Amino acid sequence: FKTVLSELQNKSEEIEIIDLYRCSFARPRDQLVESFKKLIIWSENIYIISPVWWFRLTPRTETFFDEVFTPGFAYKFINITKTYAYPKPFLKDKKVRTYITHGSPSLPVLTLYLNSVKLRLVMGVYTFVFGWRLSLFTKSRQCWSVPFVSEAKRKKYLESVKRDIKKDIIK
């Protein structure tokens, strides 16, 4: 998070931060959800940063998706038949980059679990909301064994984040 923030600040980008763990998710949360939707509409670039817990993003992140990226705001279903419809995204103009941190090494997640965390996120959330595009896969970066990597590896991860941000803000 700090690297993303400092790189954006260095480029004088206008920034709004949603820290899901500083927000009260007590019900009713209609005003909170509406404030999130306004920020999504306002934004050009969206950065989602989350650790993985139990092969999914954190509960707050998942709740954010469930309550903000709703039908009518983020997408709508277009019927093809009586029983089949496809999602038409309303946020296709947004650029999305995601950083997912894992405590586990890459090998079991990518092989035994078929990269299910990233696959579910991109196919099950992002394509509904942001549309079908290859960049949703390529701009969803996973960092592996984060609590256990060397300082050199950690710096390598952070350097890749810096490169990503520089690419994102070239207009």
Region locations from a protein language model:
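Short, glycine-/small-residue-rich phosphate/pyrophosphate-handling segment
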Residues: 77-128
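Short, solvent-exposed loop/turn segments at secondary-structure junctions
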Residues: 22-23, 53-54, 103-105, 145-146
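A structural motif corresponding to the C-terminal end of an alpha-helix
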Residues: 11, 43, 49, 91-94, ...
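Hydrophobic/aromatic beta-strand patches that form the interior of the parallel beta-sheet core
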Residues: 16-18, 47, 97-100, 137-141
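Glycine-rich phosphate/pyrophosphate-binding loop and the adjoining helix
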Residues: 108-171
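Short hydrophobic/aromatic-rich motifs at helix boundaries and adjacent loops
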Residues: 33-38, 93-98, 134
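N-terminal beta1-alpha1-beta2 submodule of the flavodoxin-like/Rossmannoid cofactor-binding fold
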Residues: 1-77, 156-171
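Low-complexity, flexible helical/coil segments
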Residues: 17-24, 39, 81-90, 131-140
